[in-house]
C-alpha cells in the first residue's frame, strides 16, 4: 500500500472504507502514462467528473487502466458535444476496443507518447466485482487476447486480422498492426458481398460498384479514402469502417501473402504467384489485391474495372508514403474468352447414294480426300490433336454409355473418324450411315465371311441422324493392343480417278501433304503452281508406303500402355514392316501364332466367299486385337468403298492392278502378311 499524496498513511480498515474506484487508483502500479508538461491535474471543484473522489483523488481512468464512460459502454461513442479528450494507449500491436466491440480507439489530439509497456498490464488479482465496477479491460498476459470478461457476445478474430480504428470526434483515422488476436462483437454484420461498407447511425452507405477503398494520409494528418477509380472522398466521422464477411468477423489480408477466402458463391479462390488472390463471383472472376483493397462485386450489378496503368500509378503514388497503410498490390487480369467447341462438320462422304462412301480409316489420307472435295486433311499428323477429341466430346454428350465408349475409343480411332461414331447400346457401336457399307454388311451376314466381320444390327435413327449399328469388337478384351492394316494394292476406286480426270482441279492441300512427306516429290511445274491434282497425289501416296510393295500398309498401332503411333507413311521396306509387327506383339510368339492362325482361316473364307469374288474391296482394313490374357483376333472392317462388280465379273484379288481390270490386290497383300508373321513366329 503506497502513501496517498493528499492523505496520511492508511491502515487496512481505512483502505477498505474507500470507494472501489479510489482504492483501485491507489493500488495501480507505477510507471503509467505521464502527463505532458504544462498540463496540471485539476484541483477539487474544477469541473472534475462525478466519478472522481473528493480531495483530488485519481481520475476514473487511471495510469495503466483503460476505463470507458457509460456512453462508450453502450456502444454509442463519446456523447455529442463532448470536448474532453481521452487518453490513448500504445500497446505491442494490440488495441482496446470499446464495449460494443467495434474496434474503436480514441486518442488525445497531438499527443502520442509511448510509455513503458510493462506498465500497461494490469494486476490479475483484481476481483471480478472490481472489474465490473470500473468497467476495466484486462489483458490476460497468457494468450495475448484483449477481452471483456463480462461480454458474452464477443468472438475471437484470427491472428492475421488487423483492426480498423476510429478516432474521436476530432481525431484522425489510424490503423494498428496486430500480431495477437482481438475480440469482435458477433452482431457487427452487414450484407455479405465482400464490399466495404460505411455503417452510420442513420444510414448505410455503400461504395460505388468497382471502387476499391483504401486510405491515404493528407497534409493535416487526417485520412482520406482512395478509390480504385482515382476519386477521393472525405472520411465520414460518424461511424466506423467495417469489412463485413459472412461469418461476422473482420479480417485484413496479410501484406506478405494473401490468404484464400471463399467468395460469394462458395468457390475457393486461387493464390497467384505474386501473393495476390483472385476471387470468383457469380458471373465471373475478379482479381483483388493481396493487402487492403478488395474488389468485391455486389449481387445486383457488374464490376467495372479501371484502366490498369492509371490505377497502379495512382495507388502507388498516394499510398507508398504511409507506414501504417501498406501499398496494395493490384493486378488486373484480362478476361480471356473460353474457346468454343468446334461443331461437328458434315460427313465427308455422300450419304445415301450408290456413290457415297464412309471413312475406311482415320489414318488414310487419300480416303478422306477422295470424295470430300473440300480439302480436309485426314492425316492425323496434319490435323489438330484436339480436333478429334472435340468431335468425340460432342458425340459423347448424347451417350448413356460414355465410360464404355471411352474405353473402346482406340478402335474408333484406328478404324474411322471419331465424328462418324456414337455409342449405342451396351456392346454396340453406331457408325454414320453409308449405303455402300450397309449393303455390304447385310450381305456379309449371310456369307462365309460372317465370323470375320462385325455383327450388323441394322439402321437406327438417333438425334436426327441415321446410323449403322454394329458390334463393338473390343467388348471382350482387357487393355487391348490394336493395329489397323490397310489391305490391297490401292486405296482408291477407279471411278474416283475417272471423275478426277474429268474435272481436274489442282489442290494446294494435296501439294502441302506431298511436300511434308517428300519435298522432292512434286515436279517443277507442281512446285511452281504450289498444287497437285488428286489422281497424282493418290498414286504417289501408294508408292511411298508398303501398299505398292507388299499389298498392305500399317495405318496405326495402339499399344496396351496407351502409346499410339501412326507415322508409317514411309514404312515401305520389308525389314521396316517386320520390325513394326514384332514390336506390336512385344516379341510374343504365342500371340504371333494366334494371329497367323486367324489370318489363315480368314484367307480360306475369302477364297470361297461369293461376296468377295464379286466385289471390289478397296480401302478395307484388317483389325488386329490382343490383350494380356492371350486373346487374339482379326476382323475385316470398313466397307465404305466396297462396291459390287458388273454382272458376271469376278476378281482374283491377286493380280496386279491395271486401270480397267478392277483388281484390288487384297489376297496378294494377305499372302504377304501371313508369310511375314509366320517368319516372325518361327524365328
Swiss-Prot record:
Composition skew (Gly residues), residue ranges: 44-58
Annotated organism of origin: Homo sapiens
Main EC class the enzyme belongs to: transferase
Residue span of region Disordered: 1-124, 147-308, 334-387
Entries under Pfam families matching the protein: IPK (PF03770)
GO biological process: cellular response to calcium ion; inositol phosphate biosynthetic process; phosphatidylinositol phosphate biosynthetic process
Positions with a binding annotation for ATP: 431, 471-473, 484, 558, 638
Family in the record: Belongs to the inositol phosphokinase (IPK) family.
Tissue/organ expression: Highly expressed in pancreas, skeletal muscle, liver, placenta and weakly in kidney and brain.
Gene (UniProt): ITPKC
A Gene Ontology molecular function term of the record: ATP binding
Phosphoserine modified-residue sites: 127, 162, 404
Presence of the UniProt keyword Transferase in the record: yes
Motif (Nuclear export signal): 324-332
The keyword Hydrolase appears for this protein: no
Entry EC no(s): 2.7.1.127
The organism's taxonomic lineage, starting at the top: Eukaryota, Metazoa, Chordata, Craniata, Vertebrata
Region (Calmodulin-binding): 509-517
PANTHER family reported for this sequence: INOSITOL POLYPHOSPHATE KINASE, INOSITOL-TRISPHOSPHATE 3-KINASE C
Biased composition (Low complexity): 13-22
Protein's name in the database: Inositol-trisphosphate 3-kinase C
One GO CC annotation: nuclear speck
Regulation: Activated by calcium/calmodulin. Inhibited by high concentrations of the substrate Ins(1,2,4)P3, and allosterically activated by the product Ins(1,3,4,5)P4.
Binding site for substrate: 486, 507-513, 534-541, 641
Location relative to the cell: Nucleus; Cytoplasm
Amino acid at each position: 500500500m503506497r502513501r496517498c499524496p493528499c492523505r496520511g498513511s492508511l491502515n487496512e480498515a481505512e483502505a477498505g472504507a474507500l470507494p472501489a474506484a479510489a482504492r483501485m487508483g491507489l493500488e495501480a502500479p507505477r510507471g503509467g502514462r505521464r502527463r505532458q508538461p504544462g498540463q496540471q491535474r485539476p484541483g477539487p471543484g474544477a469541473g472534475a467528473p462525478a466519478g472522481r473522489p473528493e480531495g483530488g483523488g485519481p481520475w476514473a481512468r487511471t495510469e495503466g487502466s483503460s476505463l470507458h464512460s457509460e456512453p462508450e459502454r453502450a456502444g454509442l461513442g463519446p456523447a455529442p458535444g463532448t470536448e474532453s479528450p481521452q487518453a490513448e494507449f500504445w500497446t505491442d500491436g494490440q488495441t482496446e476496443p470499446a464495449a460494443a466491440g467495434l474496434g474503436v480507439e480514441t486518442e488525445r489530439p497531438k499527443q502520442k507518447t509511448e510509455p513503458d509497456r510493462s506498465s500497461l498490464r494490469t494486476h490479475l488479482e483484481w476481483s471480478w466485482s472490481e472489474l465490473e465496477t470500473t468497467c476495466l479491460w484486462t489483458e490476460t498476459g497468457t494468450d495475448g487476447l484483449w477481452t471483456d470478461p463480462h461480454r458474452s457476445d464477443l468472438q475471437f478474430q484470427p491472428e492475421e486480422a488487423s483492426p480498423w480504428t476510429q478516432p474521436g470526434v476530432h481525431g484522425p483515422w489510424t490503423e494498428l498492426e496486430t500480431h495477437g488476436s482481438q475480440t469482435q462483437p458477433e452482431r457487427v454484420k452487414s450484407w455479405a458481398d465482400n464490399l466495404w461498407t460505411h455503417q452510420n447511425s442513420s444510414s448505410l452507405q455503400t461504395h460505388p460498384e468497382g471502387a476499391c477503398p483504401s486510405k491515404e494520409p493528407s497534409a493535416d494528418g487526417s485520412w482520406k479514402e482512395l478509390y480504385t477509380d482515382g476519386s477521393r472522398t472525405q472520411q465520414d466521422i460518424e461511424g466506423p469502417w467495417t469489412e463485413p464477411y459472412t461469418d461476422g468477423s473482420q479480417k485484413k489480408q496479410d501484406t506478405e501473402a494473401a490468404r484464400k477466402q471463399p467468395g460469394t458463391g462458395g468457390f475457393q479462390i486461387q493464390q497467384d504467384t505474386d501473393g495476390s488472390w483472385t476471387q470468383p463471383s457469380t458471373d465471373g472472376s475478379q482479381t483483388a489485391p493481396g493487402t487492403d483493397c478488395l474488389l468485391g462485386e455486389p449481387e445486383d450489378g457488374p464490376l467495372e474495372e479501371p484502366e490498369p496503368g492509371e490505377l497502379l500509378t495512382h495507388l502507388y503514388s498516394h499510398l507508398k508514403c504511409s507506414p501504417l497503410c501498406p501499398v496494395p498490390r493490384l493486378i488486373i487480369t484480362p478476361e480471356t474468352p473460353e474457346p468454343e467447341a468446334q461443331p461437328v462438320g458434315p460427313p465427308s462422304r455422300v450419304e445415301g447414294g450408290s456413290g457415297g462412301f464412309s471413312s475406311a480409316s482415320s489414318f488414310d489420307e487419300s480416303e478422306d480426300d477422295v470424295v470430300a472435295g473440300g480439302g480436309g486433311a485426314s492425316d492425323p499428323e496434319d490435323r489438330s490433336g484436339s480436333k478429334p477429341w472435340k468431335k468425340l466430346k460432342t458425340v459423347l454428350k448424347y451417350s448413356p454409355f460414355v465410360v464404355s465408349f471411352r474405353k473402346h475409343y482406340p478402335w474408333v480411332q484406328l478404324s474411322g473418324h471419331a465424328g462418324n461414331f456414337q455409342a449405342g447400346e451396351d456392346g454396340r457401336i453406331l457408325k454414320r450411315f453409308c449405303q455402300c457399307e450397309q449393303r455390304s454388311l447385310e450381305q456379309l451376314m449371310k456369307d462365309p465371311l460372317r465370323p470375320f466381320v462385325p455383327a450388323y444390327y441394322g439402321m437406327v435413327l438417333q438425334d436426327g441422324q441415321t446410323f449403322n449399328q454394329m458390334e463393338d469388337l473390343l467388348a471382350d478384351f482387357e487393355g487391348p493392343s490394336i493395329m489397323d492394316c490397310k489391305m490391297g494394292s490401292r486405296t482408291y476406286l477407279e471411278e474416283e480417278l475417272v471423275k478426277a480426270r474429268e474435272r481436274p482441279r489442282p489442290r494446294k492441300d494435296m501439294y502441302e501433304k506431298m511436300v511434308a512427306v517428300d519435298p522432292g516429290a512434286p515436279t517443277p511445274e507442281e512446285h511452281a503452281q504450289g498444287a497437285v491434282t488428286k489422281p497424282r497425289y493418290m498414286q504417289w501416296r501408294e508408292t511411298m508406303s508398303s501398299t505398292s510393295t507388299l499389298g498392305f500398309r500399317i495405318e496405326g498401332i495402339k499399344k496396351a500402355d496407351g502409346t499410339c503411333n501412326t507415322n508409317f507413311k514411309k514404312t515401305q521396306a520389308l525389314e521396316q514392316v517386320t520390325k513394326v509387327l514384332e514390336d506390336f506383339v512385344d516379341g510374343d510368339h504365342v500371340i504371333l501364332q494366334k494371329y497367323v492362325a486367324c489370318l489363315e482361316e480368314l484367307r480360306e473364307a475369302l477364297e470361297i466367299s461369293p461376296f468377295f469374288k464379286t466385289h471390289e474391296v478397296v480401302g478395307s482394313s484388317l483389325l488386329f486385337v490382343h490383350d494380356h490374357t492371350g486373346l487374339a483376333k482379326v476382323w475385316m472392317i470398313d466397307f465404305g468403298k466396297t462396291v459390287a462388280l458388273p454382272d458376271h465379273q469376278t476378281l482374283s484379288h491377286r493380280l496386279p492392278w491395271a486401270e480397267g481390270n478392277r483388281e484390288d490386290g487384297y489376297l496378294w497383300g494377305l499372302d504377304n502378311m501371313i508369310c511375314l508373321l509366320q517368319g516372325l513366329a518361327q524365328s
